[in-house]
């Protein structure tokens, strides 16, 4: 686990930014998106090219190539869910999108966790312009598409909508677990209790 990263750090940052934008500008809008079938869509050749920009040891690259090529599914596409290397590869692959959003587009309030990301801003029109560019980039650079559920919506007390991200409904002063998250936890606890009782 990387220090200052992860679900809680992302939720803290989103909450802090939500407060800051609201105090500075009043209205707040959110662009929320995720990559469609992310792990199954990662292009092997592009992933290997990205790895070669960061790693220069031939033995290490041969080993990583073998891991990537051993992925089940369509030849040349997809990495298995759950592998530790897959998590590393997935983060490195979408680092290209992070750099594009932050450096090329100049987006300040951008947070990504694996294949889910949000962009916060006070101007809805600016978010719409960024959305068009962000939706083009993953396909042209990485052969990925954003999910059809991608949306821009107002956040705040005026419409009663919370910032829904990383399993939380995020408000300026507190966070609540999503109802689906609570249901999943209860279900797992019931299964665990049954397993212990058996």
Segments from the language model and where they lie:
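Active-site substrate-recognition loop segments, prototypically the cytochrome P450 B′-helix/B-C loop
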Residues: 1
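Conserved polymerase palm-domain catalytic core
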Residues: 8-9, 13-114, 118-149, 153-155, ...
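Active-site and adjacent loop segments of nucleotide-processing enzymes
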Residues: 164-198
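Non-catalytic nucleic-acid substrate-recognition regions in nucleic-acid-modifying enzymes
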Residues: 4
